[in-house]
């Protein structure tokens, strides 16, 4: 009788552990899904439109800014979550901005040192990451209220979602406007990355509509339409 009770207790404990483990896995998956698709900062929240539309003229520029944004998001979420209990609620926003500005400055200096051509190309949009609503929004809505690991994962997921949206829009505009993709990628990853550059079609003149700001709005509209269509089909 005692053995049977012990077995039942052990089985119950295993079930509880399994349920907790599954719940943890579902949390990680949900955070990732929110950043990549369900609550994508670019095509759902429509945040950070200024750099999204201005820098996405080529896939390389878009990818560079996307990676910088992802790095800043991950780092700021990490720091804010780590010190969330010590940050006074009354002055939390200025403190968040200081943390974000410090991180952006570090990223800017790194890009200036190692990817100077891309740094010149992105120009003012690197320091403008400080004012990006995505970063301050995730700091306030998630990092200040959740555990360190979940906050790191949220920052990475949201940053990756933004980087993917930027790169897809940049690739679309570059292909239609210039007939190339990842032109100048060696400025970001070095000479060994030149194999990523492809000439889709050869043209003597560029399709200026897609290179200029109107093309950014058209491309973003197409991305929004495709996402909404996929969501409607899933329903």
From Swiss-Prot:
Top-level enzyme category: translocase
TM ranges: 63-83, 93-113, 117-137, 152-172, 206-226
Alphabetic keyword roster: Cell inner membrane, Cell membrane, Electron transport, Membrane, Translocase, Transmembrane, Transmembrane helix, Transport
Membrane topology: Multi-pass membrane protein
Entry keyword annotation includes Acetylation: no
Signal sequence region: none
Main location: membrane
GO BP annotations listed: electron transport chain
EC number(s) given by UniProt: 7.-.-.-
Family the UniProt entry places it in: Belongs to the NqrDE/RnfAE family.
PANTHER family the UniProt entry points to: ELECTRON TRANSPORT COMPLEX PROTEIN RNFE, ION-TRANSLOCATING OXIDOREDUCTASE COMPLEX SUBUNIT E
Subunit structure comment from the entry: The complex is composed of six subunits: RnfA, RnfB, RnfC, RnfD, RnfE and RnfG.
Identification of the protein by name: Ion-translocating oxidoreductase complex subunit E
């Amino acid at each position: 009788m005692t053995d049977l009770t012990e077995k039942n207790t052990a089985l119950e404990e295993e079930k509880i552990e399994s349920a907790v483990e599954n719940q943890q896995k579902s949390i990680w998956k949900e955070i990732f899904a929110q950043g990549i698709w369900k609550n994508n900062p670019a095509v759902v929240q429509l945040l950070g439109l200024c750099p999204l539309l201005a820098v996405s003229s080529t896939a390389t520029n878009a990818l560079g800014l996307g990676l910088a944004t992802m790095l800043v998001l991950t780092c700021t979420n990490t720091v804010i979550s780590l010190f969330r209990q010590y940050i006074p609620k009354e002055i939390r926003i200025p403190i968040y901005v200081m943390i974000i500005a410090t991180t952006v400055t570090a990223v800017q200096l790194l890009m200036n040192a190692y990817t100077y051509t891309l740094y010149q190309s992105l120009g003012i949009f690197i320091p403008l990451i400080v004012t990006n609503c995505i970063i301050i929004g995730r700091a306030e809505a998630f990092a200040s209220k959740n555990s360190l690991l979940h906050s790191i994962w949220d920052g990475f997921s949201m940053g990756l979602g933004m980087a993917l949206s930027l790169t897809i829009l940049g690739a679309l505009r570059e292909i239609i406007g210039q007939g190339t993709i990842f032109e100048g990628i060696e400025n970001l990853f070095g000479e060994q990355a030149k194999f990523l550059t492809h000439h889709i079609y050869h043209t003597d003149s560029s399709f200026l509509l897609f290179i200029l700001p109107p093309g950014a709005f058209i491309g973003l509209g197409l991305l929004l339409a495709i996402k909404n269509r996929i969501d409607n089909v899933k329903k």
